[in-house]
């Protein structure tokens, strides 16, 4: 319930951890339309991630994005670890690619949040264009959504996220939690930062028990997840007005969850 996954999904995860094979039950699966929708969205997100990664590695098409990431001092190994990608500034690049490569429907693409349908017409276009792409993962490294960051000041907003879907609930997700959870348990401490780059940079420098709120105020569900992994939280947010406000709110919520809380100023 805390991790917002169904009973069959929980059973599958626990069986995989214990190395116990589960019997196939195709009739049960076929009667669970929501589960089938979630599975389809996961496959679609995986296909999109591979596409975005290929664009970043493209010798010419991904050059501007690679130069930008190099200017932020990110190593190739870090980019690969997080499966960072690039969405070119075209209106239908992903849409065209996915429809060629799979039997996915336009409605599934809309439900995933990867494409947008114009309100006044039937026209559709890619949500992410001209942006660095951050795949957002659940606790088990399933890709549930995406964040995109523009590399040019004139392209606003600076950050753009997937809308909420069957897989992605923003208030229940922390960027990097899938990779950080073991280190958080080991240290019995979690470091909270604001953005994707903040979290990635910390890990690149050897600090592994770090997660990011991605510019939003910490929620009760996120705090509950953290409390299940550690007793102490350290908040390192920006020193601007918004950052100080987010730190104060996060402090209060974490204290309500009986955590030891420190704020770095």
Regions found by a protein language model. Name each.
Residues 4-11, 38-45, 174, 220-223, ...:
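Amphipathic alpha-helical transducer elements in NTP-driven molecular machines
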Residues 78, 143-145, 152-169, 188-191, ...:
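TOPRIM fold recognition
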Residues 131-137:
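A short, hydrophobic, proline-anchored segment that marks a local hinge/packing element in signaling
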